[in-house]
Amino acid sequence: MDMSEIPEPLRLRAFRLLMQTMDQHDAHAWLSNCAKTPENLRFLIEGAGIVGDPSYLPWLIQQMTNPKTARLAGEAFSLITGLDLVNSDMERKPPDGGDAGPTDDPEDPNVETDPDDGLPWPDPNRISRWLEVNGSRFESGTRYFLGAGVTRENCIMALKDGYQRQRILAAHYLCLLEPGTVLFEWRAPAYRQQRLLAAMH
């Protein structure tokens, strides 16, 4: 399937939710089919992180060597393992031109926003060594979310301490775990979110 055939602006949101709702077997099959189209590489990387199977981790490290996919692959790796690339000193300096994006120059033809803006540049060598030491903690065929299972407790922790895209996934997981749950409003003012989180215990 070519994801470009799905109309924007809901394409990426629909894809993420699809990956969250699919079981492991169906998700692997879907991603394998997705991999047949080179233009789907970014979807494939993000999907691997959401599916959460640690069998994807070595492949994600390979994607970190490509400047075009490095940061997204790092985010996907963190999504599975829970490894904070910044606090664990697993990031590197951006390559020359790696942070290229829109400028203030009216003559600059590059007007597209960098979809990975704000994500750290992962160091594949350090991360590979980390995986050699810690890989035995993860069981292939199991869905992981930030280093643990997809549980209510883990999702609440992600809502409290996670990055924004992790928090969005956690909010959706809570609804999937407990059908009928009102979707946590991650866009609400901070004080309101804190009040909602306090009521979830």
Residue ranges and their predicted role:
Residues 1-201:
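Long, helix-rich interaction regions
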